[in-house]
Design a protein with these regions (language model features):
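Aromatic-residue-lined binding/catalytic grooves and analogous aromatic/hydrophobic interfacial grooves
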Residues: 1-354
Length: 354
């Protein structure tokens, strides 16, 4: 799980040393010119995971789950997971709301009182501090960085559990739910990063991230889940539904995406399934851009907004020679102009700094 503005702040080699710039074979006049053209040696560091949410089963069952199925509804940006355990069918539903800036998870079962879960949060952040009080898990901290004198980034996360079952705070990072029919989890995270369009400050605001995320959680917790879900769908579809793609011979397929991909690679799918997969892949690309680049956020990096750990591959940073083009070629060509805005604003914010 990632918060898009969380990263550390300097460029180091594989041994953790700040990289030096030395050109012993060049005349001083040339090295001076090179130094004048370069940016700050202390780059923005790594885009990092803020942590992981675990939902641990406490049913005591030793059986294997059956009929396990995961579905991404890209028409509405809703993910569902279903499985059967000891004759009970369990369902989870996930979405991330752009208008309300939070993530929701809803757990249900078709048998009364069947939900017995531990909701826990862990973090790879060495300086992250996790606590739990009642139905709420809170984490605050800052990334572990190499230039604490110039990196003032702070982060906060709050996770609230709402249920008709019994709730209990356990240890420092668990909310235990017992005998529930429904469990709803709301999570929001944030930092004190603030984009600056001039050079008047260093991108770090005086905002206290915990105050911001706590207010968000309080706001969404007071609303009806279905209303929050509908607001998310409406916001997403205002962009997504602008474009449809029709290919000759394509019809809706009920086969799994894994089956379609395997058959397509081996050239054994039907024409109808092949055309359907091409449409699905096209719309999946639009789904990814909508999900990773919205107004008011940083632009999608070379891994979009999805990365694992403290040191993901290639930081993940912005490669101006390839990844920006790969991410954003469909912004204008597939009628997602608003998704281009974060990249344009990010570039404009760099201009005053040379």
């Amino acid at each position: 799980m990632n918060e898009f503005t969380e990263n550390n702040s300097s460029y180091v080699d594989d041994d953790g040393n700040v990289v030096s710039y030395d050109y012993p074979s060049l005349p001083q006049s040339v090295t001076d010119a090179i130094e004048a053209l370069k940016g700050d040696k202390n780059l923005y560091g790594n885009y990092q995971s803020i942590g992981d949410i675990y939902i641990d089963d406490r049913s005591g069952s030793t059986s294997e789950a059956e009929n396990y199925r995961r579905v991404l509804d890209i028409d509405n940006a809703i993910t569902t997971l279903t499985y059967t355990l000891d004759g009970v069918e369990y369902t989870r539903e996930y979405f991330v709301s752009n208008p309300d800036n939070f993530m929701a998870i809803r757990l249900t079962a078709d048998t009364e009182g069947a939900l017995n879960k531990d909701i826990r949060f862990t973090t790879p952040q060495p300086l992250g501090r996790i606590s739990v009080e009642g139905d709420t898990i809170t984490m605050t901290g800052r990334p572990q960085d190499h230039r604490a004198d110039i990196d003032h980034l702070e982060f906060a996360l709050q996770l609230k559990v709402i249920s008709d079952g019994e709730l209990e705070a356990v240890n420092n990072n668990i909310v235990r739910v017992s005998n529930a029919n429904e469990i709803i989890i709301y999570m929001s995270a944030g930092t004190n990063y603030q984009q600056c369009m001039d050079d008047s400050f260093d991108y770090f605001s005086d905002e206290i991230p915990l105050d911001t995320v706590s207010e968000r959680i309080q706001t969404v917790s007071a609303k009806d889940y279905d209303d929050l879900k509908q607001a998310h769908i409406d916001d997403y579809r205002e962009l997504y539904a602008r474009v449809t793609l029709s290919l000759c011979g394509a019809t809706q397929s009920d086969r799994s995406t894994k089956f379609l991909l395997s058959g397509y690679r081996n050239d054994i799918t039907s024409v109808s399934d092949s055309r359907y997969l091409e449409i699905l892949y096209y719309q999946f690309g639009r789904y990814l851009l909508i999900s990773s680049s919205r107004e008011g956020s940083l632009p999608a990096n070379l891994q979009g907004i999805w990365a694992d750990g403290l040191y993901p591959p290639w930081n993940p940073d912005y490669h101006a020679n390839v990844n920006i083009q790969m991410n954003y070629w469909l912004a204008e060509s597939t009628n997602l102009t608003e998704c281009h805005t974060p990249m344009i604003e990010y570039i404009n914010s760099l201009v005053p700094r040379g």
